[in-house]
Amino acid sequence: MKIAMVTWEYPPRIVGGLAIHCKGLAEGLVRNGHEVDVITVGYDLPEYENINGVNVYRVRPISHPHFLTWAMFMAEEMEKKLGILGVDKYDVIHCHDWMTHFVGANLKHICRMPYVQSIHSTEIGRCGGLYSDDSKAIHAMEYLSTYESCQVITVSKSLKEEVCSIFNTPEDKVKVIYNGINPWEFDINLSWEEKINFRRSIGVQDDEKMILFVGRLTYQKGIEYLIRAMPKILERHNAKLVIAGSGDMRDYLEDLCYQLGVRHKVVFLGFVNGDTLKKLYKSADVVVIPSVYEPFGIVALEAMAAGTPVVVSSVGGLMEIIKHEVNGIWVYPKNPDSIAWGVDRVLSDWGFREYIVNNAKKDVYEKYSWDNIAKETVNVYKIAMEMMGR
């Protein structure tokens, strides 16, 4: 099968989890014997590369200060690129998130191209409502992507329910296919000495427990509530919170640390990926995912593969990945006391920690490999192709 995958981010250009998802899926499809062309953005990167068997084509849309206007320019350039490559050679086009749906919808109508849309989150879920004209416009485009596409893929059952409710999408049009990872990439060998030296290099002392947060510094990710939990955590444990991520809330969060008197116990690393991220997971004593809204939560899988216990908010897709006190811990969202309890539960009981870590690693290897997810995705492609008479 020849697949065109359209996404606004793809490694090494990483904005969030979407880039990692698209890379994992594209390479999984290639390993399953399919040919994949990725159409993405990359101003300072080559216009074409073959990365692990995936053909990556990059466009360079005109810059614009207004993100929605820029997204329109981007979609136009992506459509042009597909025209140059030859649209007719593809069996299906797979678009990711709202800003690429114009490409899929136009090619469906003009070329009768089977069009599959992946929705990784919704504007209402990300922002807690529609509070600006831009949000309303994005919401409208999300709706159009569900209406125009032949099939919709969501990354969790909870997101499917959200999509069907918000956009009135027929349930049989929406297929749930979980995110995945390559577990062996995060299950690295790190000696005790290497771990200690790495922790020292990022400001964690030998006698401190390391609490890790990985993600964007946004309201959606709930990092504020983890910081607010730190005074209570420090009552029972000598710990340091390491924050790996960037975002608009950085200044606010640093001010909050000073207000709570915990600035000396919090390290802001900024955006981290690659080997450094893998070492962070392996070196941490616990990974906390305090999200307010989380359609899936790929960070949980990465931590589970690394053999580090996870404490997660009981929201969205996280509740589908994590079973409370079996392969991780649930805590209440937006509740610092509950987060502190969850962290203490893991740090205070070594036997329990080992129990959930072993279960988590077993789950991630058995249920969340990209090769299996690619096979499920191909089944959705086939449905879309049948609908368009291919």
Curated annotation (Swiss-Prot):
Pfam family, one: Glycos_transf_1
Presence of the UniProt keyword Glycosyltransferase in the record: yes
Keywords, comma-separated and alphabetical: Glycosyltransferase, Transferase
E.C. number: 2.4.-.-
Organism domain of life: Archaea
Gene Ontology molecular function: glycosyltransferase activity
InterPro entries in the cross-refs: Glyco_trans_1, Glyco_trans_4-like_N, Glycosyltransferase_grp1
Glycosyltransferase keyword on record: yes
Similarity-based family: Belongs to the glycosyltransferase group 1 family. Glycosyltransferase 4 subfamily.
PANTHER family in alphabetical order: SULFOQUINOVOSYL TRANSFERASE SQD2
Protein name per its UniProtKB record: Uncharacterized glycosyltransferase MJ1607
Organism the protein comes from: Methanocaldococcus jannaschii (strain ATCC 43067 / DSM 2661 / JAL-1 / JCM 10045 / NBRC 100440)
Lineage: Archaea, Methanobacteriati, Methanobacteriota, Methanomada group, Methanococci
